[in-house]
Amino acid sequence: MEKEDNGSKQSSSASVVSSRRRRRVVEPVEATLQRWEEEGLARARRVQAKGSKKGCMRGKGGPENPVCRFRGVRQRVWGKWVAEIREPVSHRGANSSRSKRLWLGTFATAAEAALAYDRAASVMYGPYARLNFPEDLGGGRKKDEEAESSGGYWLETNKAGNGVIETEGGKDYVVYNEDAIELGHDKTQNPMTDNEIVNPAVKSEEGYSYDRFKLDNGLLYNEPQSSSYHQGGGFDSYFEYFRF
């Protein structure tokens, strides 16, 4: 009898362990987003929550968390950036008070993590999505034909991750913050350094031609080749995309 009892206990414990293991299976992020894109359109969705404005808790995460204002993005202690998003509540049922948190991955810069968040939010929430770059990304996902016809560069001026980032389409972008950008006036004497990005000449609507952009402490200096530009005179701010 004792042997039979021990055998039944072992079988029951094994079934419990196996059931726990089955519950731990996590659906890949790509599959989750594809499911929302295919099936979620017919579901009633709530407007995405605004979220907390306080950001990451003080003393938690990386040193640049206090200056990061991207939605769904935070920094690890070792410097990497992570992105995550909550699925709409309606996906788990009308009686659910909290939604499932979806891990989107680890990234080298805050801007890359913010782009990943925007793509996921656009798929899950559609027109109700709250995006980090609502105008620049066109709803979080750039169509192939738009990416081919656009060669714009964005400059991100916060401390989170200045520099060029790569998207899935192979296009390089530099994210910018319009409020923190200044255009230099008397920078024609500065030699080029390793920070500079050399691009083909860009023709603007005003007739100027720009072929060099210098990244220096979050400031964007460009040197026009027009004869009408005189040293120290400067030019008006121009924050639109440059089309190559």
UniProtKB/Swiss-Prot annotation:
Induction: By abscisic acid (ABA) treatment. Induced by salt, heat and drought stresses. Its main location: nucleus. One of its GO terms (molecular function) is transcription cis-regulatory region binding. Expressed in xylem tissues, stigma, anthers and region where sepals and petals attach the peduncle. SUPFAM superfamilies: DNA-binding domain. Disulfide bonds: none annotated. Residues 69-134 bind DNA. GO terms for cellular component: nucleus. SMART domains: AP2 (SM00380). Residues 1-25 are annotated as: Disordered. Transcriptional activator that binds specifically to the DNA sequence 5'-[AG]CCGAC-3'. Binding to the C-repeat/DRE element mediates abscisic acid-inducible transcription. Involved in the regulation of plant development and tolerance to abiotic stresses. PANTHER family: DEHYDRATION-RESPONSIVE ELEMENT-BINDING PROTEIN 2A-RELATED, DEHYDRATION-RESPONSIVE ELEMENT-BINDING PROTEIN 2C. Belongs to the AP2/ERF transcription factor family. ERF subfamily. This is Dehydration-responsive element-binding protein 2E.
